[in-house]
């Protein structure tokens, strides 16, 4: 077996190259089928996101170059045109890479959790397409376990590193829980949408979205809750807001000092927490001079983000140690399995051969008028004696020669509790016929 990872990502290829080898879900199924039907891979999983395309395969005799050639042919690219952007890992280095990817250590945003879900989707799609068998199934379960350990045992995902997430995190630090707070969001672009989603996940009490184009604000509130207003209506609703987060494309400030002064009077000087993540700014800087306003800018958030990035980098060093250990553990288990598998197959074949001989003998006597009950009893006794003959003879010799380790191993292997044996009988039958 040779495990191979072949791919491109945001570090090795620009977007115009990545999009050339990006698989849609329908293409993934077709590509998996091709890899199998053309004899290029025993097993395969394809991961395709905006930042990476990776092919995970197990090979017997095919060389990685044939997978490269197939990739060029599949996307109708000129021969070797993207080779300089491709990376390749084999065996234990492939395992380490897959563990790093699933743990977010190889992501554009260090430690981001979305990649694990994307890998799980890729695995399930390949499994559904009958492209995953024993080796990749075992490996991916180990990879999922490792990714979970990285997130549990390190702080890789605990510190926000996006502006939207940091804005909400800062709001939670200020208020604690957000269930009783009202948030006013200025704008309806991608950043505001992310802020709104994070606020909803944090159980914000009420949500108001103000935007120049009212229909865009309505689209967000329809999916996320709250209500929409136009920018002209802000003055009528500003006093309701405990939290104001602004991110419009306005060339001049939206919130004026006088507007906030009036809102504070209506609030009876109840504090307002404001974050201006727009450039140019949406909130007049002088508003931060009020004793009851707490105004942060995108630069303040950037300091938090940079500090959190440093924290994640420290956690990444711990995560690398986990990856190294778990990759070695999986490889050791796999190699041990590979050593024992031929022995199991030979033992099963011996038992199957004994069964066939005994069965044919019984059928012959049955056709010649033998008593069925006597023949069944004889068949059962023959199979029992023949199957037990070799192990019991060898065990007897081990006793005569004082081989205590062999005796202990035999006791553990042969004297299985009946409940365990019955529980595993279905698996035994499945393996015997596979």
From Swiss-Prot:
Pathway: Porphyrin-containing compound metabolism; protoporphyrin-IX biosynthesis; 5-aminolevulinate from L-glutamyl-tRNA(Glu): step 1/2. The record marks 97 as: Important for activity. Possesses an unusual extended V-shaped dimeric structure with each monomer consisting of three distinct domains arranged along a curved 'spinal' alpha-helix. The N-terminal catalytic domain specifically recognizes the glutamate moiety of the substrate. The second domain is the NADPH-binding domain, and the third C-terminal domain is responsible for dimerization. It comes from Hydrogenovibrio crunogenus (strain DSM 25203 / XCL-2). Homodimer. This is Glutamyl-tRNA reductase. It comes from the Bacteria. Catalyzes the NADPH-dependent reduction of glutamyl-tRNA(Glu) to glutamate 1-semialdehyde (GSA). InterPro entries: 4pyrrol_synth_GluRdtase (IPR000343), 4pyrrol_synth_GluRdtase_dimer (IPR015896), 4pyrrol_synth_GluRdtase_N (IPR015895), GluRdtase_dimer_dom_sf (IPR036453), GluRdtase_N_sf (IPR036343), NAD(P)-bd_dom_sf (IPR036291), Shikm_DH/Glu-tRNA_Rdtase (IPR006151). During catalysis, the active site Cys acts as a nucleophile attacking the alpha-carbonyl group of tRNA-bound glutamate with the formation of a thioester intermediate between enzyme and glutamate, and the concomitant release of tRNA(Glu). The thioester intermediate is finally reduced by direct hydride transfer from NADPH, to form the product GSA.
């Amino acid at each position: 077996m040779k495990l191979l990872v072949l791919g491109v990502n945001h570090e090795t290829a620009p977007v115009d190259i990545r999009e050339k080898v990006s698989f849609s879900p329908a293409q993934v199924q077709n590509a998996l089928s091709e890899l199998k039907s053309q004899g290029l891979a025993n097993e395969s999983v394809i991961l395709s996101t905006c930042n990476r395309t990776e092919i995970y395969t197990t090979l017997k005799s095919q060389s990685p170059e044939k997978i490269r050639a197939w990739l060029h042919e599949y996307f109708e690219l000129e021969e070797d045109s993207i080779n300089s952007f491709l990376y390749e890992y084999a065996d234990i280095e492939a395992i380490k890479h897959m563990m790093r990817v699933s743990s977010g250590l190889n992501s554009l945003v260090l430690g981001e959790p979305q990649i694990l879900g994307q890998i799980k989707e890729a695995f399930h799609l390949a499994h559904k397409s009958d492209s995953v068998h024993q080796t990749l199934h075992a490996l991916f379960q180990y990879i999922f376990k490792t990714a979970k350990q990285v997130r549990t045992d390190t702080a890789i995902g605990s510190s926000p590193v996006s502006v939207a997430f940091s804005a909400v995190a800062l709001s939670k630090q200020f208020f604690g829980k957000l269930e009783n707070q009202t948030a006013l969001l200025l704008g309806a672009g991608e950043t505001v949408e992310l802020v709104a989603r994070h606020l909803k996940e944090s159980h914000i009490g009420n949500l108001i979205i103000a935007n120049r184009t009212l229909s865009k604000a309505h689209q967000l509130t329809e999916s996320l809750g709250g209500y929409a207003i136009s920018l002209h209506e802000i003055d009528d609703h500003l006093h309701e807001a405990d939290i104001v987060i602004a991110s419009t494309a306005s060339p001049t400030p939206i919130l004026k000092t006088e507007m906030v002064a009036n809102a504070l009077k209506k609030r009876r000087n109840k504090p307002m927490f404001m974050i201006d993540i727009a450039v140019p700014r949406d909130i007049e800087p002088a508003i931060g001079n009020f004793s009851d306003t707490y105004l942060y800018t995108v630069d303040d958030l950037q300091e938090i983000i940079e500090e959190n990035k440093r924290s994640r980098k420290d956690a990444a060093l711990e995560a690398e140690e986990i990856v190294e250990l778990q990759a070695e553990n999986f490889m050791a288990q796999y190699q041990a399995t590979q050593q024992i598998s031929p022995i199991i197959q030979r033992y099963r074949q011996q038992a199957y051969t004994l069964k066939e001989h005994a069965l044919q003998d019984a059928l012959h006597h049955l056709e010649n008028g033998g008593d069925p009950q006597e023949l069944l009893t004889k068949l059962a006794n023959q199979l029992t004696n023949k199957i037990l003959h070799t192990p019991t003879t060898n065990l007897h010799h081990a006793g005569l020669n004082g081989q205590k380790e062999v005796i202990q191993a035999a006791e553990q292997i042969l004297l299985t509790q009946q409940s365990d044996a019955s529980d595993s009988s279905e698996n035994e039958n499945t393996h015997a016929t596979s």
